[in-house]
Amino acid sequence: MLVKVFSFFILMIIMVIGVSKEYCDDKQSCQNLLLELKAGSSSLSEIRRRDLLIIVLKNSVRRIDMAMIGVMDDTKQHEEMENDMLGVKEDTNLFEEMMESEENSHTWLSSVLTSYITCIDEIGEGAYKRRVEPKLENLISRARVVLALFISISLRDNTELISVIPNGPSWLFHVDKKDLYLNAEIADVVVAKDGTGKYSTVNAAIAAAPQHSQKRFVIYIKTGIYDEIVVIENTKPNLTLIGDGQDLTIITGNLSASNVRRTYNTATVASNGNGFIGVDMCFRNTAGPAKGPAVALRVSGDMSVIYRCRVEGYQDALYPHSDRQFYRECFITGTVDFICGNAVAVFQFCQIVARQPKMGQSNVITAQSRATKDVKSGFSIQNCNITTSSDLDTATVKTYLGRPWRRFSTVAVLQSFIGDLVDPAGWTPWKGETGLSTLHYREYQNRGPGAVTSRRVKWSGFKVMKDPKKATEFTVAKLLDGETWLKESRIPYESGL
């Protein structure tokens, strides 16, 4: 019997690793991980594809969790890093629920890898980095291998799929069905500068929100300019901020890379909680074009929705950092890489507006940072208008649709208006030839003077799509798995093309 079990598992290894080199670059690491899992499993003779997925995921979470202990011991002397690691560790507590769907599991694993890479990017230099970096690299390596195995197993046989929850996981849009088109009578708490609300600051209202709640908590923010740095912790899911309008309710700050070491922490508003919804307000960073990265809004929680909001900044203005996000009817303006990050994000019916950058700079709309082919991430810009602000001198400043922050950067521009501000090349390199053959840049049925593709870049990673089936891969239904969760948000959306 033991011989049978072992032989079966070796067969599974051959099947999984043999799916193709395309899905597991480091075959030895994948095989070693599977052998680790075999040693801890007692009944593999009856294993099915779904069971193998669960074994891989559960055991990997446990091993990643153990590996994190060593990193966190070192980060106790570094408050920012410790908070980041605690955030990732907190996310593992949701994993049992996330496993109820392959889509959720893939998103979660991608998010974990994104968090590790963000940490190592922003550690800085010196003795601390030399001590912590090897441990973080170990975490990144393990997360990459787990992702590769996950993809390989998932693609083996789609006749037995893990069931997808009809309306998203229980922590999102729970039994309460509070309508998003709110007023002060329906909101849980009201923020007002004039004293007519329970709180006068946004931070005070967020502090009052319950932790780990499965019910939605709605904060209505009345007209006013709120000069404060707002951080929504990942212990506060299902939070809604709703204002009186994107020109009336404004949260503003001016942190930048010139006075805060990490781009990640420059955000005027940072949401780390799953199920975040922002409606009818403005997120602003006034640091200016000369101060470097300065984020107005960073979103790091899964199944987040930004609706009818204004995001206003310069470099790195909007930072869709990780997980699934949906932006609808928003006004987004900036200069260099002003939509950047590693989220799975779809933008529909948004105004994307390039403004005047620092002298000598070019504008770049997107800097998507998908690091490996197994990570689930990418930006889709659908039915949007890409235009210029009145202050942009298009005669002297070039504007591009995007550049690859990392090798597998993924961006699609679909059915959108592209103004004449966009350079005929369309896209620009990050550094030399890096990523030009591995990125995924796509355009489909765009219009406007900047949509002409005859002079676009000749990179092998760039394509003009003709087949609607291929373009469909970048829609809400396919890219976001939006049909399983967006409808409960009551935000309008287009599922397909």
Curated annotation (Swiss-Prot):
It is found in: Secreted, Cell wall. Transmembrane segments: none annotated. SUPFAM superfamilies: Pectin lyase-like. The record marks 315 as: Transition state stabilizer. Disulfide bonds join 330-350. One of its GO terms (biological process) is cell wall modification. It is an enzyme of class 3 (hydrolase). Glycans are attached at residues 238, 254, 385. Substrate binds at residues 263, 403, 405. Pathway: Glycan metabolism; pectin degradation; 2-dehydro-3-deoxy-D-gluconate from pectin: step 1/5. It catalyses: [(1->4)-alpha-D-galacturonosyl methyl ester](n) + n H2O = [(1->4)-alpha-D-galacturonosyl](n) + n methanol + n H(+). GO terms for molecular function: enzyme inhibitor activity; pectinesterase activity. One of its GO terms (cellular component) is extracellular region. Acts in the modification of cell walls via demethylesterification of cell wall pectin. This is Probable pectinesterase 30. It comes from Arabidopsis thaliana. The gene is PME30.
